[in-house]
């Protein structure tokens, strides 16, 4: 009999790493270390990008598969719904309209996650996502941080970025699921963004 609940094997290790990076990133953001906080968001994105691919290569029971799906969704909530909002607040975006945009963003993110979970339970064989996957928030928010740092308009670009991303979460558009070389391309983009954050981030 196991002493602890859950599963702790290579099929979920990246998901746990993503959760840990999100919590660390929020702590760094609230401590004013924005560059390192944003780098943690890059880690969250990379972890979520590849965790499913690794999990599918592992031999798992049905219970382990379901557990993986659930913790992946919960991790996405922390990493790509709450974490970007904390980054925005830590940048000083705390006026009433910033808060309103942040609330809309979180609601859109959880709506997108809920829709994905229902769709996945019905069919996992589709070749397209409906609505922007929340993982892409990492690329968008990090890009906004870089642009804002270069142009000194972070207080403007971040709320706009969150609003547009929120709309894309719930907009009924089809987005092809990444496969093959797309994973390599997204990985290279993540590396490029991380390097840019290091050199131009505040």
What do the PLM-derived regions correspond to, one by one?
Residues 24-39, 78, 82-103, 143-158, ...:
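Helix-coil boundary and interhelical linker segments in multi-pass alpha-helical membrane proteins
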């Amino acid at each position: 009999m196991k002493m602890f609940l859950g599963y702790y094997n290579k099929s979920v290790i990246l998901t746990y790493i993503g959760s840990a990076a999100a919590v660390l990133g929020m702590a760094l953001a609230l401590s004013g270390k924005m560059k390192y906080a944003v780098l943690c968001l890059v880690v969250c994105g990379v972890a979520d990008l590849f965790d499913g691919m690794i999990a599918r290569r592992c031999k798992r029971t049905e219970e382990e598969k379901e557990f993986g799906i659930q913790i992946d969704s919960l991790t996405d909530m922390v990493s790509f719904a709450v974490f970007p909002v904390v980054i925005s607040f830590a940048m000083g975006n705390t006026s009433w309209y910033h808060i309103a945009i942040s609330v809309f963003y979180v609601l859109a993110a959880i709506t997108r996650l809920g829709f994905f979970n229902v769709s996945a339970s019905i069919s996992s064989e589709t070749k397209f996502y409906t609505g922007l996957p929340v993982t892409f928030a990492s690329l968008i928010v990090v890009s906004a941080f870089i642009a804002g740092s270069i142009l000194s308009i972070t207080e403007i670009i971040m709320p706009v970025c969150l609003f547009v991303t929120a709309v894309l979460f719930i907009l009924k558009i089809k987005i092809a699921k990444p496969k093959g070389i797309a994973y390599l391309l997204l990985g290279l983009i993540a590396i490029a963004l991380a390097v840019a954050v290091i050199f131009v981030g505040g």
